[in-house]
Amino acid sequence: MKGDGRAGAHPEPTLKIDNQPLKREGSMTVSFAPVIQKVAPSVVKVFTSTEAKPNASRRGPGLEQFFGEKFRGFEFPDMQGSKPKSGLGSGVIVSPEGYILTNNHVIEGANTVKVVLSPGNEEYAAAVVGVDPKSDVAVLKIDALDLQPIELGNSDQILVGDLVLAIGNPFGVGQTVTMGMVSAKGRSNMGLDYEDFIQTDAAINPGNSGGALVDAEGRLIGVNTAILSQSGGNLGIGFAI
């Protein structure tokens, strides 16, 4: 594992932002492979280890936002509550300096955080350099070279009906891409103080939390955060911030 994961003074991130509107007219796209090839190296796996509390509550049904102990992004089975818990989620590299966006609930309470790059599966210790529980956003930092940061889009310009791609690490199976559309904008009543969610029918499952929601040109327009589900699996109602 590379890096020591300690927080400290860090350089300002260099962000690549594209505010141009999405091109909505033209010939139909038959493959998003070029977009995925561009974006995939920017999406990482996030692994956490947390000292477990005896008899901690387990995940229940309903709105699977994975907040805190009850709704962590995804927890590996733990038969004995006294053992450390391992959790996983996803993250998005947003600058060549190693800054990574994820959800606060993915890393909340974790004693250690590791990031695994794709491709190559290089593993790095990550420092938590910023959190905002009220909006469920966290910023990690790794010390790595030759990172490929994602291009940032403008979520204010998306429209209901725009195609979107969700990229993450559902259930720990590895990087996975799903496609859907923007189902609604401005969703709220999700239990956060600051809410303005993008709703999508792109498949989002436990482990996708913190992953990328990108437009048809591969620009980041949201961070996948929650699903509405009674079973804990995808039912076509996902939310990104």
Predicted regions and their residues:
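Serine-dependent protease modules
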Residues: 2-241
